[in-house]
Curated annotation (Swiss-Prot):
Its EC number is 3.1.3.5. Its main location: cytoplasm. Belongs to the SurE nucleotidase family. GO terms for molecular function: 3'-nucleotidase activity; 5'-nucleotidase activity; exopolyphosphatase activity; metal ion binding; nucleotide binding. It catalyses: a ribonucleoside 5'-phosphate + H2O = a ribonucleoside + phosphate. It comes from Chelativorans sp. (strain BNC1). It comes from the Bacteria. Binds 1 divalent metal cation per subunit. This is 5'-nucleotidase SurE. Pfam families: SurE. Gene3D superfamilies: Survival protein SurE-like phosphatase/nucleotidase. GO terms for cellular component: cytoplasm.
């Protein structure tokens, strides 16, 4: 099996190294094309207004000045002599749950693979803070990842469906199991912070916040909150099918 890896945290991210070790439990034919710098929050964006520059680290590892979507396209269309059988994106430092999947470069890497007709899976891992220091239990993904990946690769999926996997922020021993979930709903508390540069001109930072919201049973949020690994099948068809007939009647 030939596997292509990417992420949005960048070529030097610990999560990418973890994912490569997990992938190598399945195959030795593993390739990596990942962003040169952190591309978190770039979602499914393409670099169309400037050229892509790629740095070859070795025969199987490449760093690209581009987005995760760019990386998948370059890997499949340029770097590899034949397409991969599987695309894995991650392991992201921080979960990608509910509405956050629309912002996630990690999820977008798997989305692009699916658009190219290749089975794709996104992996993310929760973190906690200890005295304002981010603590990521990477061993949770590394210990549980191989067996889970083998099962997911063996599962039958329809065309246009990819998987979004999230590990909880606990040790491997504390994980209660794996649940197949639906996408939850977040209430964002986005805000804009204005600052001034040395010449007095304003510049701005977008700040993510979270407002209290009800977590529905069976969702990715509920699984992570309760200490389970969440596996959410997502698809590319964004049509609101339940509304079509009603809308057609309104327009008749």
């Amino acid at each position: 099996m030939r596997i292509l890896l990417t992420n949005d945290d960048g070529i030097h991210a610990e999560g990418l190294a973890v994912l490569e070790r997990v992938a190598r439990t399945l195959s030795d034919d593993v390739w990596v094309v990942a962003p040169e710098t952190d591309q978190s929050g770039f979602a499914h964006s393409l670099s169309l207004s400037e050229p892509l520059r790629m740095r070859k680290i070795d025969d199987r590892h490449y760093a690209l000045r581009g987005t995760p979507t760019d990386c998948v396209i370059m890997g499949v269309r340029k770097v590899m002599d034949r397409p991969p059988d599987l695309i894995l994106s991650g392991v992201n430092s921080g979960t990608n749950l509910a509405d956050d999947v629309t912002y996630s470069g990690t999820v977008a890497g798997a989305m692009e693979g699916t658009l190219l007709g290749i089975r794709s899976i996104a992996f993310s891992l929760g973190y906690s803070f200890v005295e304002d220091i981010r603590v990521v239990q990477w061993e949770t993904a590394e210990v549980l990842g191989p067996a889970l990946l083998k099962k997911l690769v063996g599962a039958s999926l329809p065309q246009g469906v990819f998987l979004n996997v999230n590990f909880p922020r606990c040790t491997p021993e504390a994980v209660k199991g794996t649940l197949v979930t639906s996408q939850g709903k977040l209430v964002h508390g986005l805000s804009v912070e204005e600052r001034r540069d040395g010449r007095g001109f304003p510049y701005y930072w977008l700040r993510f916040g979270r407002q209290e919201s009800e977590i529905r049973a069976g969702t990715d949020q509920a699984a992570i909150r309760d200490g389970y690994v969440s596996v959410t099948p997502l698809h590319l068809d964004l049509t609101a099918h339940a509304v079509r007939d009603r809308l057609a009647k309104a327009l008749a």
